[in-house]
């Protein structure tokens, strides 16, 4: 994402000073030009490699898909698209907030960030709901868990997110500041109030609601799974796997999405209040630090691919055809085995021919005719 105070006037050395509301705060953001290029570079390499491998497994190794694998496939597609766009941001921040590319590319990079962010949230929500239904309504989930239903849900998710994030292409723009071109992640100054209202709606619709659903799923599953079936002790393996999956989803939310949305909301709110420069500097720094965490979900999502299903966990073993080990000559002699030679083959053929001749001579003609009629 671009600099947090993008609508403020920038100085040449990367600090920021007041806006139209009369603030005269200057923030030293030198740390950003090291933190963001390094973190985005790591996310780009790891995220792209892990998700490309995951896509290969989904497309080339899995023979049958269920609802979970369908959602994970679309999650990997979204993460791969985002990771592929990060080299442009790495260059942008390494150059000190200078965007030498076109405005269209600036809009596309910001659009991919928010699209990946909310696609990840919604697909993780779908995985959690699917697991929860498998625990609470195992019989009904047999029909709801088909891949064809998951494909329809995934299509709805893509359409919903693309439609909701389309305004980003309108708000995001570039501006010339001295000798540099800034690629804003919010909007121009005159549209900022509209952008804040739009972001608030997206916060509630695409983050608060899914996060609440995941929390409800986790609570319901925990209550059910803490009660073992009558006459049994412990939890079945399938139920333990469901709990691990949703617990991992909650960890991803807690680490990546929650800090980002909290600090961004505070940042947008504080910009319209007459607060001290110290307070604004603190929230500005927190907002910058949480942006790499929001991007890190592209690397953490593939962990789900290897923990959620048995086929994905065993993909490395299934990738090569199973072969039986060839016994050594000593082992063959111990077991009474030996490699057949030409003499053994001739003897075996003669024995089979002799047995066939004896069976033919002992079979009555009537029996042969009867067998043919049957």
Curated annotation (Swiss-Prot):
Q: Say where the protein is mainly found.
A: membrane
The subcellular location is: Cell membrane
- Name the chain's protein: P2Y purinoceptor 2
Where is there biased composition of kind Basic residues? 331-340
Q: What gene name is given for the protein in this entry?
A: P2ry2
Q: Extracellular side of the membrane: what ranges? A: 1-32, 94-110, 173-194, 269-286
Which pairs of Cys residues are joined through disulfide bonds in the record? 106-183
Species name: Rattus norvegicus (Rat)
> Keywords on this record?
Cell membrane, Disulfide bond, G-protein coupled receptor, Glycoprotein, Membrane, Receptor, Transducer, Transmembrane, Transmembrane helix
